[in-house]
């Protein structure tokens, strides 16, 4: 089987603000809601049809690739790297997500041992800590409330600087606008913290 060349990506500008200037680097993220998955791969692009996905993504070595499932294997190919992801659970096509870029991240584990990570632009890792704490508490609350364990091994939240929606609930990989995730809890209004906690 020939590898599929994905061409349905949001182009992102990833900026470094530590130098008091904006140094742009290219990043990419898919957004398949509501019916854009068909522009990337052949499928019945309807939410009631589910499929299991096995993804391989090849990128330059300096880029990070995040998808719905954890990376199962990485293989160096010249100056590039091929990341192979674990097979997904059955899910709707519009929930498949791939994010490529340069990010910092922080992580924790929920009491059910689910890995939770928040990815931020370089230099803003600590501004993602409030989001990480809210995600952990929320996951633990809903696990107990519904009496069911979150079924995936991880939950990633990625701050994107350009997104046509406020957030996207891709299974295992939630994408949000930066201003909906990145805050300084010591220097933010209660309404800003509330907004972040709702996303």
Can you say where each PLM-predicted feature lies in the sequence?
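Hydrophobic helix-coil surface modules that form long, contiguous segments used
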Residues: 30-37, 42-198
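A surface-exposed beta-strand-loop module
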Residues: 1-24
């Amino acid at each position: 089987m020939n590898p599929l060349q994905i061409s349905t990506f949001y182009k992102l500008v990833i900026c470094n603000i530590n130098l008091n200037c904006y140094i742009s680097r290219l990043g990419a993220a898919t957004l398949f809601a509501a019916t854009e998955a068909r522009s990337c791969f052949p499928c019945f692009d309807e939410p009631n049809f589910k499929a299991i996905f096995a993804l391989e993504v090849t990128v330059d070595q300096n880029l990070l690739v995040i998808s719905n499932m954890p990376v199962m294997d990485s293989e160096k190919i010249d100056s590039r790297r091929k990341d192979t992801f674990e097979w997904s659970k059955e899910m709707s096509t519009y929930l498949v997500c791939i994010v490529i870029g340069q990010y910092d991240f922080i992580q924790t584990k929920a009491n059910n041992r689910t890995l939770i990570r928040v990815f931020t632009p370089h230099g803003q890792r600590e501004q993602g800590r409030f989001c990480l704490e809210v995600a952990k508490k929320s996951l633990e609350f809903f696990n107990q409330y519904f009496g069911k364990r979150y079924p995936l091994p991880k939950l990633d939240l990625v701050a994107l600087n350009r997104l046509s929606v406020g957030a996207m609930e891709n299974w295992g990989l939630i994408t949000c606008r930066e201003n909906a995730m990145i805050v300084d809890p010591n220097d933010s209004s209660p309404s800003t913290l509330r907004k972040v906690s709702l996303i």
